[in-house]
Amino acid sequence: MTKAIPKIGSRKKVRIGLRRNARFSLRKSARRITKGVIHVQASFNNTIITVTDPQGRVVFWSSAGTCGFKSSRKASPYAGQRTAVDAIRTVGLQRAEVMVKGAGSGRDAALRAIAKSGVRLSCIRDVTPMPHNGCRPPKKRRL
């Protein structure tokens, strides 16, 4: 039986430097659109804002984590506000519809930030999924 010949200089060593800031360096500059749809997803742990064009193609997205917040600070109203401002500034919207999903603490703060940013809102919809007596909810937390 012959031994496998070890490879000299694997590709993993080359990619180590590239992976460190891959998220920030590979992000494309967002297209600038005048009319679009702003989707606000406010969970209890994070706030995610996605800006799409009227056809539904994603133009830009931002979350509290990408804005620099970590752990429990991602769930704060201030994080939701900063996330909304970041998404709108980058895209440069003038007219938009807003779709809000979830019941997190960043929900109202994100809506306030969108309204103050100067974007003309045509409608605000609550698209939070509500069960019609579907699955059994998880048991209550005991601390």
UniProtKB/Swiss-Prot annotation:
GO terms for cellular component: chloroplast; ribonucleoprotein complex; ribosome. One of its GO terms (molecular function) is structural constituent of ribosome. It is found in: Plastid, Chloroplast. Its main location: plastid. SUPFAM superfamilies: Translational machinery components. One of its GO terms (biological process) is translation. Keywords: Chloroplast, Plastid, Ribonucleoprotein, Ribosomal protein, RNA-binding, rRNA-binding. The keyword Nucleotide-binding does not apply. It holds the Pfam family Ribosomal_S11. PANTHER family: 40S RIBOSOMAL PROTEIN S14/30S RIBOSOMAL PROTEIN S11 (PTHR11759). Part of the 30S ribosomal subunit. Belongs to the universal ribosomal protein uS11 family. This is Small ribosomal subunit protein uS11c. It comes from Sorghum bicolor (Sorghum). The gene is rps11.
